[in-house]
């Protein structure tokens, strides 16, 4: 196989020469990175044959995913990417032990009790409707959140908000603005099974 043939195969496998429907593309490519939504939507648009700006968000979610970054991916893949410590932490609003953000931030100021209290406020809110990040901040402030607690709960690398996302409580809405909505219920896939499936998709559609 020549170098040019390899290039063509790679472009085809990534749906750049042979577009497919939105959900097929999203599943096979393990979603698209969504640090900047404009780029994510462009990446999807050039690979799909059913792209529609009015309905593009249907069937998709936005959450923390591969490489510890925010991706847009198929809602049906929530169990694959949001594995919640092999399901042990799925919708678990208890923070006495290890948590990713707390153990990454030496200055973490939220006690387990206060984190649970603020999380309850946020979970109840997004169960009713979508809330922006600023709206959630105002809601928590109105319920007694201090500045130092806010710096943890809404920390720029995700904070307590991220922990609620990766424990299956909520997702970002699929748009540029930082807005959150309750996640549909799902059953996380066991860690090893999920990693195998992600690797299978990667080596089928992305890797050389």
Language-model features: where?
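Loop-centered beta-sheet repeat module
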Residues: 150-208
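Phosphate-backbone binding and catalysis cores of DNA-processing enzymes
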Residues: 1-151
């Amino acid at each position: 196989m020549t170098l040019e043939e390899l290039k063509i195969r790679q472009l085809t496998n990534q749906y750049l020469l042979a577009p497919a429907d939105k959900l097929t593309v999203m599943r096979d490519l393990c979603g698209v990175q969504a640090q900047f939504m404009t780029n994510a939507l462009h990446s999807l648009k050039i690979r799909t044959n059913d792209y529609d700006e009015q309905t593009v968000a249907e069937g998709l979610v936005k959450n923390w995913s591969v490489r510890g970054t925010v991706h847009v991916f198929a809602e049906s893949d929530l169990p694959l990417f949001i594995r919640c410590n092999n399901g042990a932490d799925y919708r678990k609003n208890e923070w006495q032990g290890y948590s990713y953000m707390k153990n990454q931030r030496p200055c973490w100021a939220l006690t387990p009790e206060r984190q649970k209290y603020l999380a309850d406020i946020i979970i109840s809110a997004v169960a009713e409707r979508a809330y922006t990040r600023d709206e959630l901040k105002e809601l928590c402030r109105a319920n007694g959140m201090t500045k130092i607690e806010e710096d943890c709960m809404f920390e720029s690398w995700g904070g307590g908000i991220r922990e609620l996302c990766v424990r299956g409580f909520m997702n970002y809405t699929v748009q540029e603005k930082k807005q959150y909505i309750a996640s549909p219920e799902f059953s996380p896939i066991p860690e090893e099974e999920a990693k195998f499936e992600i690797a299978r998709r990667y080596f089928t559609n992305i890797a050389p």
